[in-house]
């Protein structure tokens, strides 16, 4: 280990920065976060540093560097583009036993700046000992995606309870067990959702009584299939869950990202094949949460867009089960983007309607008159089986038979397939190409842009019709 990682409290401590340009400005930004007392010395300064001085955030000395500037300094940073000046700063600081950093010159550093993940008061520092700063930055970027923003407020909250916990539990092992229970409880999720008052109340309760484990359900949208389209929050909750309840629409690649030791429960959901009835799924979520489990109810797309997430959350709320809702990229947005089809376009579509082809058996019929209007895009979920009916009703209510359509099968996934054609042949396209779910139907002029804007996967299989279809509008 070339450098000992330590954290230094610089609050009002004197720090010298030699230099007056952009590099010096960057170093000042980090030092100001630590509330250091910063003095800069240089013959001239950039405008941003002059503005900081006018706000009394830094002190500027318009002089060339000399040994006298080192007096009483705790740290020194050389941030000039003059090698001989940087060397002079290093040698004199070393002679006075002052820690010194020469920017981008690792051999002339007795301390270095790490890459930082800041979740105040939690701070994570990553260093390559000056050998590969770009690699250290990339590691920081990875950690930024994995460490949620609420970690900082959580640390602040529990920090306020440390003395109470020490009074309550005299032995270290007991205190450690208590804190493990806190971080496994819904105190964390309450902070995450911004309800710090409820989190504090629960902490007080846990401190004064032996609380039963409190379960919670995360209703998570997994997006259309590509695991890189998951939100950070979805990934974090997937990796916290004790139990994962999922549908067939959730891709295998996404399921690979759940916590390794979590129990996996598949509840089906294909047309005509509901391996678990919806009401049974609802009750299962309640029962698991009442057992103190953290349950991730993961759904393809967005849970509140044709995912029956609203029904499940209603049951959770009625049973007073804690829950969180994590939106996902809905199929219409994700699949159309991966097919190079903008859902709206100034020249083609000023409106969009999301439609399901799988309504309740006794449900109200769709407003076909509205759906058949021109200059709009229809994004139809679960419409493969009902495509003959969809086609017939749109034509019957005046939509042009030559209206472009696109069928996106397994959108955003490695096996994505796009089939394009005209509304008048929609059902035939699906039959001839043996389209299977999950598939999204896009109906509207924007579907014609696929060939021009294609970027992912194979280009569309186009209609075999050489001539435009007869306008039956």
From Swiss-Prot:
GO molecular function, one term: uroporphyrin-III C-methyltransferase activity
Any Pfam family: TP_methylase
Reactions mediated catalytically: uroporphyrinogen III + 2 S-adenosyl-L-methionine = precorrin-2 + 2 S-adenosyl-L-homocysteine + H(+); precorrin-2 + NAD(+) = sirohydrochlorin + NADH + 2 H(+); siroheme + 2 H(+) = sirohydrochlorin + Fe(2+)
GO terms of biological process kind: cobalamin biosynthetic process; methylation; siroheme biosynthetic process
InterPro entries: 4pyrrol_Mease (IPR000878), 4pyrrol_Methylase_sf (IPR035996), 4pyrrole_Mease_sub1 (IPR014777), 4pyrrole_Mease_sub2 (IPR014776), CobA/CysG_C (IPR006366), NAD(P)-bd_dom_sf (IPR036291), Siro_Cobalamin_biosynth (IPR050161), Sirohaem_synt_dimer_dom_sf (IPR037115)
Gene3D superfamilies listed in its UniProt record: Cobalt-precorrin-4 Transmethylase, Domain 1, Methyltransferase, Cobalt-precorrin-4 Transmethylase, Domain 2, NAD(P)-binding Rossmann-like Domain, Sirohaem synthase, dimerisation domain, Siroheme synthase, domain 2
NCBIfam families: cobA_cysG_Cterm, cysG_Nterm, PRK06136.1, PRK10637.1
Name listed for the protein in its UniProt record: Siroheme synthase
Annotated source species: Pseudoalteromonas translucida (strain TAC 125)
Source species taxonomy: Bacteria, Pseudomonadati, Pseudomonadota, Gammaproteobacteria, Alteromonadales
Gene it is expressed from: cysG
């Amino acid at each position: 280990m070339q450098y000992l990682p330590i954290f230094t409290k610089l609050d009002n401590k004197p720090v010298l920065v030699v230099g007056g340009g952009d590099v010096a400005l960057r170093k000042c930004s980090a030092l100001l976060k630590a509330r250091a007392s910063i003095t800069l010395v240089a013959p001239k300064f950039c405008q941003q540093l002059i503005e900081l001085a006018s706000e009394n955030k830094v002190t500027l000395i318009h002089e060339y560097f000399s040994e006298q500037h080192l007096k009483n300094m705790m740290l020194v940073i050389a941030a000039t583009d003059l090698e001989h000046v940087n060397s002079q700063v290093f040698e004199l600081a070393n002679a006075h036993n002052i820690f010194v950093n020469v920017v981008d010159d690792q051999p002339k550093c007795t301390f270095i700046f790490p890459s930082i993940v800041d979740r105040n008061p939690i701070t994570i520092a990553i260093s390559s000992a000056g050998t590969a700063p770009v690699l250290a930055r990339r590691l920081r970027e990875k950690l930024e995606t994995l460490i949620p923003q609420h970690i900082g407020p959580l640390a602040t909250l529990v920090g306020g309870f440390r003395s109470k916990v020490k009074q309550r539990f005299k032995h270290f092992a007991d205190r450690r067990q208590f804190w493990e229970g806190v971080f496994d409880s819904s105190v964390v999720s309450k902070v995450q959702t911004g309800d710090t008052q409820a989190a504090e109340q629960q902490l007080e309760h846990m401190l004064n009584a032996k609380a039963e484990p409190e379960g919670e359900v995360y209703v998570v949208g997994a997006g259309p299939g590509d695991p890189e389209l998951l939100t950070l929050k979805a990934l974090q909750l997937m990796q916290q869950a004790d139990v994962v309840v999922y549908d067939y629409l959730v891709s295998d690649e996404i399921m690979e990202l759940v916590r390794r030791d979590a129990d996996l429960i598949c509840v089906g959901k294909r047309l005509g094949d509901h391996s678990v009835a919806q009401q049974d799924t609802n009750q299962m979520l309640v029962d698991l949460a009442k057992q103190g489990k953290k349950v991730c109810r993961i759904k393809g797309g967005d849970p509140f867009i044709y995912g029956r997430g609203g029904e499940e959350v209603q049951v959770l709320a009625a049973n007073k089960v804690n829950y969180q809702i994590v939106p996902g990229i809905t199929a219409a947005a994700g699949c159309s983007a991966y097919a190079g089809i903008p859902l709206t376009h100034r020249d083609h579509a000023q409106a969009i309607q999301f439609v399901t082809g799988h309504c309740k058996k006794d449900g109200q019929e769709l407003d076909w008159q509205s759906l058949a209007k021109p200059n709009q895009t229809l994004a139809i979920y679960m419409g493969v089986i009902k495509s003959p009916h969809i086609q017939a009703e749109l034509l019957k209510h005046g939509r042009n038979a030559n209206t472009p359509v696109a069928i996106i099968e397994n959108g955003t996934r490695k096996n994505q397939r796009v089939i394009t054609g005209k509304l008048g042949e929609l059902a035939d396209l699906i039959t001839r190409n043996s389209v299977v779910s999950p598939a999204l139907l896009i109906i509207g002029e924007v579907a014609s842009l696929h060939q021009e804007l294609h970027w992912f996967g194979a280009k569309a299989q186009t209609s075999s019709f050489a001539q435009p279809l007869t306008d039956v509008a």
